Amino acid sequence: MGQPKKWEHVIERTKGILKLRPTYVRRFYKDGGRLGLTKTPGGTFDPRTKLFVPERWIASCVEAHNPHPIKGEGLSKLHLPAPEGEVTLRDLLSEFGTVLLGEKRAKAHNNEFRVLVKILDPAEPIVFHFHARDEDVWAHPEFFAGHRFGKEEAYFFLDAPKGTCPYTHLGLMPGVDEKELLAAIEKGRDRLLELSPYYLQRSGEGYFTPAGVPHRPGTALCLEIQQPSDVYTLLETRADGRTLSPRQVHPGFPDLPTALRFLDFHTAQDPDLLERCRLVPQPIAETKQKGGQEWWIFPPTLTPKFSGKRLVVTGAFESVEEDAYALLIWRGRGKLNGKPIKAGDEFFVSHLAATQPHYFECTGSEPLEAFKLFPQRPF
């Protein structure tokens, strides 16, 4: 990274509230044109790589794993004037973890911000897939090279056009075994999806997806929070009319049957899975103020791996948190500690700033809406 004094000055100048540049990431599924990159669904397609750009990663310290790799893809960078150069959030945390993350977190998590937040913009449902569990990733490095965590994740469905198929499949019907699942994969999507229940993506609500459980996200624009991992196995072999390569379907595995050893059939067939995983925002009484209100959209009781709040400010709102967090301004205009903020802005709010009173103010004609996303608990 170099020039530690320079970056120390940046932290001091911003008082630990670090503005980040938007980070867009390629994927094999078609974008819906709702990230501001194109007005036409699929308009980001690159014929050379056969990839689209349907994801924005927020305050990310995780590198994306894609065919035709780009070094550093997925890593968030500070929003700085060109003469000041550039630095990734990951590198800054590595150098100044105690200040930015707090002493306890920096020590427990080796200067890492252990969460990954995304905005997903699918023009069509993302293919049926699952993510491995922590214990499987740790026990089988021969299959999960380069990965340190499994992936639990959760979604919050944003107030935006939902697309053509706002339904998500989650889990498997009772009695489905590996043999039946493999046969359905061979027959294609229609047969495969008959084996999985589904739910409507309701704007303003969310869902939790346990690691190891297959799912097929629908076309609603959503905020996703997850463990800091890009591990996955696909259960479909075609997307957007194109045949996917074995490397895309089961990266790290010699074949799909081997990859299916890590699917959690027991949890996937829980008859109460859909209801148990539904997330309805919970008002936070202790932070309610005249000028604003917060809700848990990913409550800390859900999992120790992450949590998140929705904040709506109509006047002035004083915020104090126990931990550093990622901040996304979703709607409206306002100020944060007196400095202008607007929809689309993204910040890393360090432990230094988060644990002291910091002030949101709505200055526009509509409420200021933001999301606060928190990492894995350190203990």
Give the positions of each predicted feature.
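Short beta-strand segments in beta-sandwich/barrel cores
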Residues: 316, 332-337
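Transition-metal
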Residues: 1-177, 239-276, 281, 308
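Functionally critical, mid-to-C-terminal surface segments that flank or help form catalytic/ligand
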Residues: 258-324
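Short acidic-glycine-tyrosine-enriched beta hairpin
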Residues: 196-208, 217, 335-361
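Non-heme Fe(II)/2-oxoglutarate
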Residues: 219-250, 323, 344-349, 353-357
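Ligand-binding loop in jelly-roll beta-barrel domains
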Residues: 120-125, 160-163, 212-231, 340, ...
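Short, basic/aromatic beta-hairpin or loop at an interaction surface
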Residues: 176-189, 322-326
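Loop-centered beta-sheet repeat module
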Residues: 185-243
